[in-house]
UniProtKB/Swiss-Prot annotation:
Pathway: Cofactor biosynthesis; 7,8-dihydroneopterin triphosphate biosynthesis; 7,8-dihydroneopterin triphosphate from GTP: step 1/1. This is GTP cyclohydrolase 1. It catalyses: GTP + H2O = 7,8-dihydroneopterin 3'-triphosphate + formate + H(+). Its EC number is 3.5.4.16. GO terms for cellular component: cytoplasm. It comes from Rhizobium meliloti (strain 1021) (Ensifer meliloti). PANTHER family: GTP CYCLOHYDROLASE 1, GTP CYCLOHYDROLASE I.
């Protein structure tokens, strides 16, 4: 998993272009595409695109470990699988900057502590709101939960449609890509993987 996890440095505010520079870049792209950025329908587009991208790629400003920092120890002895499935997300392919639309299924085996359920969805959101590959995102989510919560094991499955395949190139609409990552007991004990997969199928 470590070979897949990519920890790219994030530019601080001193290294980032300004809002004005981002808007000018959009104008350049519009001209390159053959459009006139000054026409009525496009006058506000550079500003809108820059603001939208600030939200879409807001994951660069967040740290997953901070979100996962608060855990609960009062679990009444519960130590079996915790599964949160069908977590919807939108991301963007780092190769073509077009959308990836999918859902994540995440499980872990508690080791005396559990997460608030919203924290798992927030971690998915943090990594989805960056330029991504599905393989890297799968591994990043598992690593963040594994290292922060230190459970007995983590299982992550992501299924998604990549619009870089649907809109361009091979143009295969509806194709779904599945990726999985397992740590701890989910990796070393095949029976735990089977239980994870069975629970996913059982809730379909």
């Amino acid at each position: 998993m470590d070979a897949i996890v990519k920890n790219f440095p994030v530019l601080d505010d001193t290294g980032r272009p300004t809002q004005k520079e981002a808007e000018e870049a959009v104008r350049v792209l519009l001209r390159w595409a053959g459009e006139d950025p000054a026409r009525e329908g496009l006058k506000d587009t550079p500003s809108r695109v820059a603001k939208a991208y600030r939200e879409i790629f807001g994951g660069y400003d967040l740290v997953a470990e901070d979100v996962l920092g608060r855990t609960f120890e009062e679990v009444s002895g519960y130590d079996d699988i915790v599964l949160e499935k069908d977590i919807p997300f939108y991301s963007h392919c780092e190769h073509h900057m077009v959308p990836i639309i999918g859902k994540a299924h995440i499980a872990y085996l508690p080791n005396g502590r559990v997460l608030g359920l919203s924290k798992i969805a927030r971690v998915v959101d943090i990594y989805a709101r960056r330029l991504q590959t599905q393989e890297a995102m799968t591994a990043q989510i598992a690593k963040a939960i594994d290292e922060t919560l230190m459970p007995r094991g983590v299982a992550v499955m992501i299924e998604a449609e990549h619009l870089c395949m649907a809109m361009r190139g091979i143009k295969k609409q509806g194709a779904t890509t599945l990726t999985t990552t397992f740590t701890g007991a989910f990796k070393s004990e095949p029976a735990e993987q089977v239980r994870f997969m069975t629970m996913l199928r059982g809730f379909k």
